[in-house]
Amino acid sequence: SGFENLVALFGYSLQVYADFSGYTDMAIGVAMLMGFYLPKNFNSPYKAPNPGNFWKRWHISLSKWLQDYLYIPMGGNRGATFGTYCCIVTITAIGVILSGSLWIAAVVSVIALIITFVIWLKPEKRLKIHTNINSMNTMLLGGIWHGASWNFMIWGGLNGIGMVVFKFWKNRNVYLRTGILLLLLIAFLALAIFYPAPAFNIGVVWIGVIFI
């Protein structure tokens, strides 16, 4: 049934954590026997209070690398740089290659025009918008790092959306925050589906099996 598949999906997220964290703990232990001391790579990620904090607890070595070599060089929370726009072009090009169509470029162009219009109307929002773009770029490139496929682009994109939505959510009233929390839960379930799926269309089928 759909409920059983949903429970299995939550169980899979625990399995991934147990496997990944366990293997890294074994590597850390073996390294200590040889006189090397490696930093901790997981810090109870499922206790994280928000998506941003989750990525400070999960696969810490990768998260730190993405922060130091992608997010901060792009400008981080200080604004956009030339690297920000290079990343957008690169991600768009990868999307075009994967889809074999220019519709991705068209969608990105429309979004860019909308963002430019919003910045023109409200220049005081420029810094926040650029910071969120840097976050999205970082998570999308982090997804592509796992594999150049739609699965991982969606996985990275949903992670980025979760981080951006939380910034909006944390300052809102309790009813709106509850609604956004439900959306984040749905996004989390989608993340758990698309990560292990061997192909994008199979991930879509899995969603149908659970929710339809």
Feature locations, PLM:
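Membrane-embedded transmembrane alpha-helical bundles that form the catalytic cores
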Residues: 1-212
